[in-house]
Amino acid sequence: MRRGAWLALAALACAVPAWAQEAAAPDEWTVDLGVVGRARPLHLGSPRYRVDALPVVNARWGDAVALSLDDGARWAAFRDGPFSAGPVAEFRQSFNDGLPRGAFRMNDAVEIGGFAKLRTPVGEIETRLRKAETGYDGWSGDLSFDTGGQVAPKLKLGGEMRVSWADDRFSQEYFGLRRAAARREDLPRFQADDYYSAGAELDAARELAKGVALVGVLSGDRILGREWRSPLLQTRNVMTASVGFVRRF
């Protein structure tokens, strides 16, 4: 299933369900293509929603390499039984629809970092840490637990719980409505103004024909942290929903 969003903004991206994220056979490529309709907030903290359509493009080589429009790229460079770790590269899309007049429009960001994952009998525990090389230029991280499986011959369900963090450069740029002051960020910093969120996700996939599935995702996150006095933050709840079709090749 889709790996947990590192913070609520990532929940605005298209969620890809369990059916489209199963491990491929060892040393074999699998490709998933599809399209989903998505309902999401206009921007982080907005109570208003919009509906759009997004492509689903995923490629996996066994358990070693994963490429996705949603989750970026990752390579499990180190694998030892149920444990794996390696580098990740992700693209963060900023959502700037319906911003208040004069609000700072945060740029999209490319984030580079690493992940560590542990498979257990009941699910997967994963943590990630990334540095934004463009955009807000700060650090972010998340911790998630994913589980799921076959509940009927043609039906799979999945779930995720997650907590996420981003440093104060993100919250300054977004809720402060301005570009954060430039400073060197070689290592993660934890400050009183950092951004936190906690959330959960439910996935469902119903096989319609061999290699074709109807998929649906419902995701919710709660913005935590300090009480920012920002016209953007009209609600701390971020809900998204998507439904569509995916074809595996």
Would you name each region that the model predicts?
Residues 43-49, 67, 79, 106-107, ...:
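Solvent-exposed loop/turn segments connecting transmembrane beta-strands
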Residues 37-43, 61-63, 89-95, 120-122, ...:
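Transmembrane beta-strands of outer-membrane beta-barrel pores
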Residues 1-28:
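Cleavable N-terminal export/targeting peptides
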Residues 31, 63-67, 83, 122-126, ...:
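Repeated loop/turn-to-beta-strand initiation elements of outer-membrane beta-barrel proteins
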